[in-house]
Amino acid sequence: MCQNRIMFKQFIMAGAIDIVQIDACRLGGLNEVLAVLVMAAKYNLPVWPHAGGVGLCEYVQHLSMIDYLVVSGTKEGRVIEYVDHLHEHFVDPCVVRGGHYLPPARPGFSIEMKPATLASFAHRPEKASAA
């Protein structure tokens, strides 16, 4: 699994991959993702973001939109993973209709968590030491 732009560059230049599956958790942030998107566009390879964890569907919808609007200009051959769980913990969860992500209604990366969720999963040292 490619974890940075250098690994993607080596695999792409060697012709070793047909699909660029970026992993938002493994790549070092948006700038690293942008570098990979540009390389994929140069070699005419489709990008399929991986979105398997909590909040990743909310995040990768933006990466695909950036790819379409800024880098590749195409939706042809593009796929985004979708995992239908845990969206209820987000203020502005992703919405999929007819097999397509809808653009978010609010600014940001759609990963703001609800205060009740944060409170329910907060670390409580007093409870940990009692066990």
Description of each model-found segment:
Residues G108-A131:
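Extended hydrophobic packing segments that form well-structured cores
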